[in-house]
Structures are given as structure tokens and as C-alpha cells.
């Protein structure tokens, strides 16, 4: 089986039905998006997302495009800035006259640009936003792909309860995703029988987290959840925990303790760390293995969750166009509201708001430099290493 046919078969949504080889004379379907390629906050994550979009473009066009036309992404760098992204989506729709749009990186930027897409009645699949409140504003043309952030720590707390742990501390950045993860963890902890013994929100990311971490140390929690959309925060917190000899039975760095970059920066200091995860390379989703292989070949590095999310959003858009034989936002919306399927990201199903009800997060732990899925039971790829040993008993040299 050749590579193109393999992707068409395994990814399902790129089946040969309804596709024909695009003529060079046919105009491409232009898909606009902004992505955080630069900027201090999201450039790592945005870079992964952009590559996911571009790989999907390559595969769709290799199979003949959709409706006999190739697809072409028009992607601008929003610099990790909400106002810039708003201007760019206005430009994409009003000036560039793109045929469709897909979402940017992150809940905050997605929430901001959704006002633009709603104004123009332009459907937007949002592959990298996981905050429930975005879908509580009566928006019609916004489709969610990721599981809600409130459930991101369910696996962590389920495992904590199973192992007899009783107390939880939470520190988190003041932002849409981090707030939802922290709120969800606090509520889940009560249901699992864990007491919340410390909670602190920080608004500006400090270079030195020792003040907060010393308060955590005094609270003596069994479990610590650190939540931030800034990878730099999670790296600094983990590193400074070692410096302060702050030991917990379980540490979760959410949501980006799961990124390869987290381990690359920390080395063995990242061992035993947990994180929720919206996607993992080894999960048995249709086409996932071939997606990972193709991504590594194309970009000479492993994909991250944003790569898979961008690719999957493109998958869904192409399938909606194929089903409706249209680029009309209302028709595409109706197709997606009734679609129940699997992408490389996992299950997809939304309610009448476009809010995700099918996709579920898993929980991973860093073990010997690898992300091992340790929850839920039906998807595990290895055994949890519990408890986390004290820093004094660990070899953390890189």
C-alpha cells in the first residue's frame, strides 16, 4: 500500500469518496488562520500547531484535494498577542477573502478572535481551546475539539485517591485554561475525597516562584498541581522545587508538562512528573501512527498535541466540505453538529453549542524520558511509578 493510500485508508476522513484530482487551473480553497510563531507566551505551542495545519494540507492535496480543488493555508504570526490576532482574522476575512478559517493557538486568543468570526458568520473549528466559558456566550459558528479543561486532572486525582493520598495544593496562572484546570481540579478533589489545603493564583509570571513554593511546602500536600499555559513557568516551578527540596507524592505540571520541550529543558528533573494530555503519539486512534511517522519525516522532530490538534481540525473541515459539497458556514456547521467520528486526536462529537462532548483527556507520567499513559486503564501503556521519591534520593543529572 503506498503512502497516499495508507493515509486515505487509516485517517478515514480522507477517503477517496468525493475526492478528485485537482486541476492546475482550479483555484485552491484558501483557509486562513493566525498562529503564535513568535512571542514569549505561546511560540513553542503555536509552532507545533502550524506544522499540523501544513502537514494536513500536504496530505489532502496529495489525495486530490476536496471537491476537485486543492487546499491552501494562509497563516499569519499573531506574536502570541490577542489584539494582533483579532486584526489578523479581520484581515483574513475582510481583505484576503479567504474561503474558510481555522482557529489559532490557545483559549485566550480563540476567545478574542471568535468575536470576529461570529461577526462575519464564518465557521471556525477551534483545535486548541479547552475552556468551557468560551462556549457559554451564545456563539453559533465556533466548534470545539479538545476535552474541557475542567476535567484535565481527573486521572491525576483518581490515581491519587486510589493510592490513599488525601491532600492537594494548587498553584496556577490567572488565565482561561489554567483557571479552568484549577477550578476543575478543586471540584474533582472533593469528589475523590481529597482536601484542598492550598490554592494560589498568580497574575504575572515571576522569575522566582520560591515565595509561593515555600507556602506550598508549609502546607505539606500529598499532591501538587501547577497549571500555566507558559511552558517557562512549569519548567521554573519544577526546577525550584528541587532547589527548595519541596517533595510531594505526586506533581502535575499542566497542561504543558506533557510537551517534549518540558523534558528537553529539565532532563531527569522531569522524571515522575504527571500531566493530563489531550493526545499522545501511541494512542490507538485511526491514522495516528501514520500521522506521527509522517510528521517526524516531514519536520525531523516528534509531534506534540498541538500538531495533532491542528491536523485533526483540518481533517474535520475537509470532511464537512466533502459531506456538504459546500463552503457555506451554516451548512458546514450542521454537518459538524451531527458528525460522530474519530480523528488522529481521538473522539469527536459536539452538542448544539459546538461544545465538545466526545473527546477525553488521558494522564501521562514521564518515565525514562518517555511519556507513558497511565490513565485511564483501557489506554495505559505502562505502570504508574508511585510514589515520587524525594529529591535527595533521585539522580537528576542530565
Features from the language model and the residues they span:
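Extracytosolic ligand-binding ectodomains
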Residues: 2-17, 21-398
Amino acid at each position: 500500500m503506498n503512502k497516499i493510500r495508507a493515509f486515505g485508508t487509516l485517517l478515514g476522513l480522507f477517503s477517496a469518496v468525493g475526492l478528485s484530482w485537482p486541476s492546475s487551473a482550479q483555484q485552491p480553497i484558501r483557509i486562513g488562520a493566525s498562529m503564535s510563531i513568535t512571542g514569549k507566551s505561546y511560540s513553542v505551542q503555536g509552532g507545533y500547531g502550524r506544522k499540523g495545519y501544513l502537514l494536513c494540507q500536504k496530505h489532502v492535496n496529495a489525495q486530490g484535494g476536496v471537491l476537485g480543488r486543492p487546499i491552501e493555508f494562509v497563516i499569519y504570526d499573531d506574536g502570541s498577542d490577542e489584539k494582533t490576532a483579532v486584526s489578523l482574522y479581520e484581515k483574513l476575512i475582510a481583505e484576503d477573502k479567504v474561503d474558510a478559517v481555522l482557529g489559532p493557538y490557545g483559549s485566550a486568543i480563540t476567545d478574542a478572535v471568535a468575536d470576529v468570526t461570529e461577526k462575519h458568520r464564518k465557521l471556525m473549528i477551534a483545535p486548541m481551546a479547552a475552556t468551557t466559558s468560551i462556549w457559554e456566550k451564545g456563539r453559533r459558528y465556533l466548534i470545539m475539539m479538545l476535552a474541557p479543561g475542567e476535567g484535565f486532572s481527573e486521572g491525576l486525582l483518581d490515581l491519587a485517591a486510589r493510592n490513599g493520598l488525601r491532600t492537594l495544593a494548587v498553584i496556577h496562572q490567572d488565565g482561561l485554561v489554567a483557571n479552568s484546570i484549577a477550578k476543575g481540579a478543586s471540584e474533582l478533589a472533593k469528589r475523590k475525597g481529597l482536601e484542598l489545603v492550598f490554592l494560589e493564583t498568580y497574575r504575572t509570571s515571576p522569575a522566582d516562584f520560591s515565595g509561593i513554593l515555600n507556602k506550598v511546602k508549609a502546607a505539606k500536600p500529598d499532591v501538587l498541581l501547577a497549571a500555566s499555559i507558559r511552558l517557562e513557568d512549569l519548567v521554573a516551578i519544577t526546577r525550584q522545587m528541587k532547589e527548595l527540596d519541596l517533595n510531594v507524592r505526586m506533581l502535575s505540571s499542566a497542561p504543558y508538562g506533557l510537551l517534549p520541550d518540558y523534558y528537553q529543558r529539565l532532563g531527569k528533573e522531569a522524571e515522575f512528573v504527571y500531566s493530563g494530555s489531550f493526545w499522545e503519539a501511541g494512542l490507538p486512534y485511526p491514522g495516528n501512527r501514520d500521522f506521527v511517522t509522517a510528521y517526524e519525516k516531514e519536520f525531523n522532530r516528534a509531534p506534540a498535541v498541538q500538531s495533532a490538534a491542528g491536523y485533526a481540525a483540518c481533517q474535520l473541515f475537509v470532511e464537512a466540505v466533502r459531506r456538504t459539497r459546500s463552503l457555506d458556514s451554516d451548512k458546514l456547521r450542521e454537518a459538524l453538529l451531527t458528525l460522530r467520528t474519530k480523528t488522529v486526536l481521538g473522539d469527536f462529537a459536539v452538542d448544539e453549542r459546538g461544545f465538545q462532548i466526545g473527546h477525553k483527556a488521558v494522564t501521562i507520567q514521564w518515565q525514562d524520558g518517555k511519556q507513558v499513559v497511565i490513565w485511564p486503564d483501557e489506554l495505559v501503556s505502562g505502570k504508574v511509578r508511585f510514589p515520587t521519591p524525594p529529591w535527595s534520593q533521585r539522580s537528576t543529572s542530565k
